[in-house]
């Protein structure tokens, strides 16, 4: 089964082997399959069908969300290691992952906003406000002692660049 972040950190700090799937392995799996989905979606021809374009955009949206969560898992793991060891390198890794995570939220929201209303009602969590959540994603970087340094983002067809909408 999966190993929790606290269990993993305890084993990591004490240099003890663990049985199961670590949080970093979970993140790697999510990133792998997100990349596969994005590569596949990028090869599809969207010229003939509006419905197909929306479906492909949904696949891309979920892949970007996967990348967001994968980097959040890595950030949470590194932050827990930092809190146990107080070694600055783990705080730096945390900030790097939070910046990556915020950047992927931006990609997720860009495609999501191009096809959906904001905020969007979802059955599981209620309303999701993509712009507000982007602000939270950037706050996570600064509240952990980092500076915003998100990956560059190219505009997508029909997409919205969130910075242009005064969300940062």
Feature annotation, model-predicted:
Residues 146-168:
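Extracytoplasmic
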Residues 1-154:
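Catalytic domains of carbohydrate-active enzymes that cleave complex glycans
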């Amino acid at each position: 089964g999966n190993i929790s972040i606290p269990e993993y950190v305890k084993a990591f700090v004490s240099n003890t082997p663990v049985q199961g799937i670590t949080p970093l392995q979970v993140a790697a799996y999510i990133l792998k399959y997100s990349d596969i989905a994005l590569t596949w979606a990028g090869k599809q021809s969207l010229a003939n069908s509006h419905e197909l374009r929306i479906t492909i955009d949904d696949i891309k949206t979920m892949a970007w969300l996967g990348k967001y969560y994968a980097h959040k898992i890595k950030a949470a793991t590194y932050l827990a290691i930092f809190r146990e060891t107080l070694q600055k390198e783990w705080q730096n890794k945390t900030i790097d992952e939070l910046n990556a995570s915020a950047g992927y939220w931006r990609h997720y929201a860009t495609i999501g906003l191009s096809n959906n209303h904001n905020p969007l009602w979802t059955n599981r969590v209620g309303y999701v406000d993509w712009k507000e959540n982007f602000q939270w994603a950037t706050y996570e970087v600064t509240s952990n002692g980092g500076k915003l340094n998100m990956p560059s983002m190219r505009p997508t067809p029909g997409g919205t660049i969130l910075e242009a909408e005064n969300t940062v």
